[in-house]
């Protein structure tokens, strides 16, 4: 293939290279094999250049390495017959390099980016489902996994490495994908993992406290998210006008589509817009009446809570901006399915309603509790914990929110990792006014079981934090555990 040789791959940057055929591209020397291109980047934890001898021993055809402190930009050396090309700022160039290697897959499908603290997974899933109902072959990439709808393979990170992203997109194109919805994390933006992708549209859901252990403060976190619009090929911009940050961004994005549930739309100021006119919540979901610059309509949704209505409206606005007809979108809307582990409802006769959600930030927990309250005739229970070795500042905030919005709070473990579980729980309790009224149970399975067994049939039990996850990280061990499976077993239903 044309760009699978070293000379053609690096033609925009380096001349005089041999036309050496390349089989695969990898950042991991452990999996580098005969004929591969090994890329030696300098990361946060390791310097890939240390593994060049190992890659050569394993038979790689060529190497691209970070030039900093080693060589000049574009310098070519040879080690044991293997060409080594040094490029400066290799991490920043990696997405473009991988894009050339995999034949620019983002240009061969309609690819939509979704960024924001909360709502990324639901919005991407809705986009993929809806577009497929309209005839596309759709795929998702993100927290739940990567793949065509119905064939998603679990992943470790929301946004993989720059090479992984291009590789996965190329694989999806090869499988026939014509539409892709990708979650884009703040880490992925700062680390240039999606820098060379050509997005047909980019969606902003909201911004609230998360990842401050990485970004330091909210200003840097916002700046990371803004990179999607300021330094990337973002295509159509769709922005949540109900979010304070979103309203600020709309002032800098005059062609963006503004989306609102709360009346933050002025048709005279926003050329393209979509807003909820009325929302009625019921035990089956919600009835949404909306108006937009494309027309108006009504949607029956099986999704739970106000924030999921917002996610649905963002997906609708995105597809309208991409040219899908409103009439077709309205005809297919009722067939949209709830998303696994995202306000996912489990019910059985004579048992409490159990809702499993991924909410693991203060804002997400508040919204999940508010959503569950809309569907609760009895007591609202909240079972949650906070992750170990992560942002400690959010723990008391989440404790205060659970105490304020739930009737009964059960604090337990959620991936304690290398921290002492009781220390994490104490951090959560520190945010509560009356911690003595809180039920504390370190074992998560026991806590979930206890809550469901004690709740009455008109109660709602929100199990927050893990969502789709099927593991619990204790120490450095990844143990099998699923809130969904536990809840389903106790109710006698199938997860």
From Swiss-Prot:
Carboxylation is probably crucial for Mg(2+) binding and, consequently, for the gamma-phosphate positioning of ATP. One of its GO terms (molecular function) is ATP binding. Pathway: Cell wall biogenesis; peptidoglycan biosynthesis. Its EC number is 6.3.2.13. InterPro entries: Mur-like_cat_sf, Mur_ligase_C, Mur_ligase_C_dom_sf, Mur_ligase_cen, Mur_ligase_N, MurE/MurF_N, UDP-N-AcMur-Glu-dNH2Pim_ligase. It is an enzyme of class 6 (ligase). ATP binds at residues 116-122. It holds the Pfam family Mur_ligase_M. UDP-N-acetyl-alpha-D-muramoyl-L-alanyl-D-glutamate binds at residues 27, 29, 44-46, 157-159, 185, 191, 193. One of its GO terms (cellular component) is cytoplasm. It catalyses: UDP-N-acetyl-alpha-D-muramoyl-L-alanyl-D-glutamate + meso-2,6-diaminopimelate + ATP = UDP-N-acetyl-alpha-D-muramoyl-L-alanyl-gamma-D-glutamyl-meso-2,6-diaminopimelate + ADP + phosphate + H(+). It is found in: Cytoplasm. Keywords: ATP-binding, Cell cycle, Cell division, Cell shape, Cell wall biogenesis/degradation, Cytoplasm, Ligase, Magnesium, Nucleotide-binding, Peptidoglycan synthesis. Belongs to the MurCDEF family. MurE subfamily. Catalyzes the addition of meso-diaminopimelic acid to the nucleotide precursor UDP-N-acetylmuramoyl-L-alanyl-D-glutamate (UMAG) in the biosynthesis of bacterial cell-wall peptidoglycan. NCBIfam families: murE, PRK00139.1-1, PRK00139.1-2, PRK00139.1-4. This is UDP-N-acetylmuramoyl-L-alanyl-D-glutamate--2,6-diaminopimelate ligase. It comes from Salmonella typhimurium (strain LT2 / SGSC1412 / ATCC 700720). The gene is murE.
